[in-house]
């Protein structure tokens, strides 16, 4: 029965792990719901500020903010939003694959790369993979604040205004639903023109201070809000991916326990049969 004892020990160990993964799944569900609420709360601000920027740009067409001016790209910047913790399936791996693909496409065209990394997993990846990381921040927690991001974002925006980079993009996971998280690379500056239905029926406004000053201030706030939105959405995607990963781990543990229980029962049955055979054989000899 030595084999049976080992199997019993293994079953007990897997059951213990199953309890942990089940608890982690429940925690991830709770955190994901809170992250979804933060994501939904921050989205209207980012959308509205873009509309206001559109109105301001129309009100002052002779002035073009540097964030609106396209120029030849010799050096590109990326703000990479990753997670601080693992156990979330292929979330970070898929993100890095999408990023590396985009970086390689740029490098083939002779474009150099600067990186701002948010999250411990991103920092670890670029320590191994290599890359010119000019700013990094991690351990933002479950409820990140936009104030925590301002310093790192400013490094990249200053680089753009000084002409050290010619394009800035944010790389993060989009929360599609609880089952789907999509890695995306989105251009932040220069601002990509998008058709805005609200601007087709706009009114004339009086601006205080003037439209140019407001536009200068709002442009920076807009980029900060977009990065914050990416961080919040990536957090929701992380919790969803962790929930799925822990559910799969719990289910796999259950399947493994069933298999081991069957093996244990067969081993025990074989041992009992052997004992009976020995007893019967001994009685016959007598």
Swiss-Prot record:
Cellular localisation: Cell inner membrane
A single GO molecular function term of this UniProt record: proton-transporting ATP synthase activity, rotational mechanism
InterPro entries tied to this protein: ATP_synth_F1_ATPase_gsu, ATP_synth_F1_gsu, ATP_synth_F1_gsu_CS
Topology within the bilayer: Peripheral membrane protein
Signal peptide: none
Annotated GO biological process: proton motive force-driven plasma membrane ATP synthesis
Coiled-coil region: none
Highest taxon listed in the record's lineage: Bacteria
A cellular component term, taken from the record's GO annotations: proton-transporting ATP synthase complex
Protein name: ATP synthase gamma chain
Native organism: Pseudomonas putida (strain GB-1)
Gene that encodes it: atpG
